[in-house]
Amino acid sequence: MTTLEEISALTRPRHPDYWTEIDSAAVDTIRVLAADAVQKVGNGHPGTAMSLAPLAYTLFQRTMRHDPSDTHWLGRDRFVLSAGHSSLTLYIQLYLGGFGLELSDIESLRTWGSKTPGHPEFRHTPGVEITTGPLGQGLASAVGMAMASRYERGLFDPDAEPGASPFDHYIYVIASDGDIEEGVTSEASSLAAVQQLGNLIVFYDRNQISIEDDTNIALCEDTAARYRAYGWHVQEVEGGENVVGIEEAIANAQAVTDRPSFIALRTVIGYPAPNLMDTGKAHGAALGDDEVAAVKKIVGFDPDKTFQVREDVLTHTRGLVARGKQAHERWQLEFDAWARREPERKALLDRLLAQKLPDGWDADLPHWEPGSKALATRAASGAVLSALGPKLPELWGGSADLAGSNNTTIKGADSFGPPSISTKEYTAHWYGRTLHFGVREHAMGAILSGIVLHGPTRAYGGTFLQFSDYMRPAVRLAALMDIDTIYVWTHDSIGLGEDGPTHQPIEHLSALRAIPRLSVVRPADANETAYAWRTILARRNGSGPVGLILTRQGVPVLDGTDAEGVARGGYVLSDAGGLQPGEEPDVILIATGSEVQLAVAAQTLLADNDILARVVSMPCLEWFEAQPYEYRDAVLPPTVSARVAVEAGVAQCWHQLVGDTGEIVSIEHYGESADHKTLFREYGFTAEAVAAAAERALDN
């Protein structure tokens, strides 16, 4: 634990010359509002918001370039509260700074319908750049924002001197001990150093307290040394009240352009709560009436009043609105001059901000003739990306060290990064479009979210479907935010083959479909893959993330695939030859991905027995379920109860479509190491097995 002498030193104020009583009053107002808000609702995290009051005030009032009247301003700095549990750190600044929150919003913290939920939520509260809460996600996504900032500069103003472009800005982060402990920050921080992201500035709130009290029980590393080892520019500031040290550290960080900056700020959580500061009780619970009253006495507030904000303090802090508009106007002059110099790039920017695609963007998408050589859908996806590359400069992405397997490299594209990281295989350029995440799947997921949140580009990232488990927290958060990240997940079943059960997805499709707002797209062949990419890219921001599920093994190019049908999520691929117009089939075979070919073959076998089967390709359950019921009933007539679902995964998500009398051809156990043909045969994925299931469904 921290000694009393150390606490005294760490809480000794050091203010710059311009600092006045009104600045001190504003900081104390932040502390009191944080204590009052948590006390009123009875739960929350007051301590960090109290001890970080000087830092938050300095960042929002004195450091960041932003405009409270336009929270979507292209030239703004971004702020990421990775320590999302300390949401009051952000909310109170948004209130004091005039971003759209009022005192009543602070008073309604963590209550139904409020603008101030327990953790910051993107799209919910004006001024919140990203949803945070699961620790580590914010810092990792901030790395993506910094990468997106550089790529944006490369698209629109690549030749400007550092700091001279209207597209230059900073990404500021506040991270906690918990963020530092999470593995995703290690992954992302390592990559940030490789990328030399000089516009990324992270404040690490080193208060050494978590829910279980003193972090020494679980964290005893020299974190600053770890970040130096990564290759970051590292500074250490002693004391959360040391505004001089904070400002000097920010200035030093801004001067370093070839490395991300890490500022370890040693604070005392809960300061100035006399009995609970520097304890776990200040971290995640209300302080209690007596302790809150004591805090107010210490800072000169009336202990009997709540939510006190002096009028002169609010007038002072909301001066940020005018200052922000002035900064915006100065930036606009630079931006307008750039627009006059670069009319073509300005037109591109306008298109991206409007979320529009260029005319003819999909004209060169590849098409494969039915019956042509079998092709893995991952290979088809790679061909699609290379065809789209010249038309869509906003599209960029890569893989978690599996580019050759995932087929995620756009033909002819340089790698994104400083030229110094170039290898024999890859040529890196500051503004390249091929991303190399390394074996860092979790960071990749979070970084993709940061890229998309920053805008205005589209990003994708690939790995094996099995390793989507490593990405799941980031994928869920992207779905919660309704952002349009794209995940390319290949090697999608036991069809992966010889690598065996550790790498063969079994439960993954159902597990991913369980995430609300995530669209899971598993095309049947090369053409459905092209149609899937077309649909994904045509969707506007706010339509949610998409996981594109692709095969390792070759699959036949099918007859009857349909672009509109893919966009609807499911469609009639073929009806048995004997069916008359308007006549219903005897049985419906519903399949996805590589198993659609089995349904087609089973349809022929059933026809030999005078059973008329319909084959429905269902690349995306989520898109299909969003269709009007008239369309769904036309594809799956309710009167046809004999149904079979075929998918090389667990059956969990298919019961709703096949009903009690239907059958599911699935796999409910782990696989083995063998070639894919053997595995499919031994585990019952054959046309004969599908036909037999159809006959059972008819008998049910």
From Swiss-Prot:
Q: Which residues bind substrate?
A: 45, 283, 378, 405, 491, 499, 552
UniProt xrefs under InterPro entries: THDP-binding, Transketo_C/PFOR_II, Transketolase-like_C_2, Transketolase-like_Pyr-bd, Transketolase_bac-like, Transketolase_BS, Transketolase_CS, Transketolase_fam
Q: Which GO molecular-function terms appear in the entry? A: magnesium ion binding; transketolase activity
Reaction(s) catalysed by this chain's protein: D-sedoheptulose 7-phosphate + D-glyceraldehyde 3-phosphate = aldehydo-D-ribose 5-phosphate + D-xylulose 5-phosphate
In short, the EC number is: 2.2.1.1
Active site per database record: 441
Alphabetized Gene3D superfamilies for the sequence? 3.40.50.920, 3.40.50.970
- Cofactor: bound how, per the entry note? Binds 1 Mg(2+) ion per subunit. Can also utilize other divalent metal cations, such as Ca(2+), Mn(2+) and Co(2+).
Q: Which residues carry this modification: N-acetylthreonine?
A: 2
* SUPFAM superfamilies xref list: Thiamin diphosphate-binding fold (THDP-binding), TK C-terminal domain-like
Per UniProt, thiamine diphosphate binds at: 48, 85, 133-135, 178, 207, 283, 467
Name of a matching Pfam family? Transket_pyr
Swiss-Prot/TrEMBL GO biological process terms = pentose-phosphate shunt
Residues the UniProt record annotates as site (Important for catalytic activity): 45, 283
Its biological purpose is as follows: Catalyzes the reversible transfer of a two-carbon ketol group from sedoheptulose-7-phosphate to glyceraldehyde-3-phosphate, producing xylulose-5-phosphate and ribose-5-phosphate. Catalyzes the transfer of a two-carbon ketol group from a ketose donor to an aldose acceptor, via a covalent intermediate with the cofactor thiamine pyrophosphate.
Q: What is this protein called?
A: Transketolase
